[in-house]
Amino acid sequence: MHGDREHVSYLVAHPLLRHARKMREIEQFAGLDLPESTPESICAAVANIFHVRETEVGLLELSGRLLNFLYPAELKAAGAIPLSSSAVAARTARTKQAELFNDFTQVKHFSIFELVKLGDTGLDDQVIQKLMSAPVLAENGEVISVIQVSRKAPRPAAAGDFTPYDLQKLVSVARLVGRLMAKGKGIAQASSA
């Protein structure tokens, strides 16, 4: 009888614990100081939420018909992604849909960006194996940015899959990024100061 009560308690508490964990993770991000938000601070918070390296987070701003990297800084000068291209970030911006790829090496993408040395990581056998991509929307529903979280490793099994829950979390984070961009003077302006 005592075991039944524990089981019922677990069934009731389990979704509540999962919700509390999700809220803590989102609060980590929402706790950023809005006036001081920069692409670097936002992407560092996102990396922390998803337990990835900061160089595994990308933030691109839509400017006209091009997506330009705001973060990582090393990719700012590497070029832009045309909105009309088949790149994942471009598709995310066009469709306004979040996507998850646990087989990213099989997806057609702009691998040129993977050749740019990021931070002190150097060029090694670490390639993007897994990727999530989500649109960042303005209050009017227009795409203003795209945020991506990846996992790099020498082979797919070493990277660990993203889950549908991770993608939901990224969509929530993208909403917060949109609010940061709307409430502040904009992330791009903060990064150029």
Residue ranges and their predicted role:
Residues 11, 28-32, 40-49, 91, ...:
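Amphipathic alpha-helical regulatory segments at dimerization interfaces
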Residues 148:
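Conserved beta-strand in the GNAT
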Residues 129-138, 145:
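A short, aliphatic-rich beta-strand micro-motif
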Residues 1-37, 176, 183-193:
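Signal-transmission linkers at sensory-effector interfaces
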Residues 28-70, 184:
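Helix-loop-beta substructure at the N-terminus of cytosolic sensory domains
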